[in-house]
């Protein structure tokens, strides 16, 4: 499978205009955990949903887990559905800084085969 992973702003605009993608804002701060959602509320790419690392892309920390355990399959599928994502649409994730949370969302989609 040969898929383009990175796109330009112009390509994103075209995809949005064609209704062919779901856009997800993944901004998150590990110290100030509400900072990303606040930034999304203050401004984001039009139509973009928000992915919260702690509540959408991870399970709660347990006694035998790491800092951000993988979400269960059903939870992750439900999150994607809540964004309006279906298999016929591209999912475009964006972030700021290191883009680590956007990459996590991309990786979770690969991991779960979506």
Model segments located where?
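Cytosolic catalytic domains that perform sulfur/thiol-centered chemistry
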Residues: 1-114
């Amino acid at each position: 499978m040969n898929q383009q992973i990175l796109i330009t702003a112009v390509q994103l605009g075209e995809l949005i205009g064609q209704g062919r993608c779901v856009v997800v804002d993944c901004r998150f701060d590990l110290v100030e955990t509400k900072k990303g959602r606040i930034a999304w509320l203050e401004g984001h790419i039009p139509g973009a949903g928000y992915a919260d690392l702690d509540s959408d892309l991870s399970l709660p920390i347990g006694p035998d887990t790491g800092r951000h355990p993988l979400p269960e399959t059903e939870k992750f599928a439900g999150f994607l559905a809540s964004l309006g994502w279906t298999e016929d649409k591209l999912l475009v994730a964006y972030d700021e800084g290191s883009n680590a949370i956007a990459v996590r969302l991309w990786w979770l989609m690969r991991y779960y085969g979506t």
